[in-house]
Amino acid sequence: MSIYEPPKTGKMSLIHQTLFDLRNDGVQFAVSFVDMLNVRTLSDFLIKFGTAVMKSAASTPDAYAAIARKHLADTHFVFDHVRFMTCDELISLNWDPDMNDVEKMLRLPQAIAQEKQMPYYIIFKEFQNLMKAEEYDDVFKLMERMMRDRDRSESCPVVYVMSGAMVNAMKLIFEEKRYFYRQVNHVALMPVDEKLIIEHVVKGFLNGMGKSFDRNLAMGACELFKCNLWYVNHLASICDALSKGFVTEMMMTDALSSMISVHEPRFVSIVNDLTDHQLSLLRAVLDGVVKFSASEVIEKYRLNSSANVRRVKDALKKKEVITFNEKDEPVILDPLFEYWVSNVYFEIR
């Protein structure tokens, strides 16, 4: 399973809720969360993976060492007591890893699932970072082979959930390069219904704080943030701090200004990293352009040529500023950045 959406859109909330529901239904399973935020090399990945898996299977140094001896024999993996005490690292490498090391490590969850006689869920966070390792192609192909060859009737399967916040990098893996083709189902998060968000905000203020939050103001927040619940909650929390009995439009404007002041350094860093052509194409997106290679668009926004347009689009995708939907229409990934770059940077009124 793959889940790729921008940051703070509910990926991990969905995963945690699903696991909670399974446990609530009496389903027994093991789970490991492999946080790949700082993975840059194959060694980083293998150590992160092994540490997460072993933590879910044991709880003492002797047990960790036993897992390494039993399941990772004839590899470069060792349980290093010093590394464990100083870095909380349950598995270490005594040499550069080879593909035998990779395969043995990737098979570790299945071995543990068989021992425990229960399904095993591996949750990858920021899965796209594995592409920073030079050997990513070999690793992906090995994972594909393992998924293809596994016994579908197995009572204790290993299930991989590959999540990531870099939308275009994840699309590159699953849609463009087509790794794990027909092996992984993509779960797209649907926007939370606007009516539910409005009800959540209005009732939350009334029942929780005894305050009034006008439905029209809540609707405006939903439209501004495109129903991004994290941003709506952020705005609502500031409105709560500013208000005593009821939230006014002026308070909401002040709350939005406070949010902008918090996020503006990040937004300034984004635009400072863009070239003139990239900024021009971003302006075209804000103006509602969808056909960037049209001659009048190239001339109006000084984009030089169709070939240059393709390069600029790819650059903005790589920088995770925009993505393109199934209709090949541009979408700015961060709704608050979209508001800021439109109203503050380009001063579009």
Go through each PLM region and give its residues:
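Alpha-helical DNA-recognition elements
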Residues: 21, 238, 315-318
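P-loop NTPase nucleotide-binding core
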Residues: 5-9, 13-121, 130-131, 136, ...
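Amphipathic alpha-helical "lid/sensor" segments that cap RecA-like P-loop NTPase cores
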Residues: 197-265
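Sensor-1/coupling segment of RecA-like P-loop NTPase cores
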Residues: 114-123, 129-135, 139-177, 189
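C-terminal leucine-rich, beta-strand-based interaction scaffolds used for sensing/assembly
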Residues: 261-349
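Short, conserved phosphate/pyrophosphate- and ester-handling motifs at nucleotide-, phospho-/glycolipid
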Residues: 12, 228, 334
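Alpha-helical sensor/transducer elements of the RecA-like P-loop NTPase core
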Residues: 13, 159-206
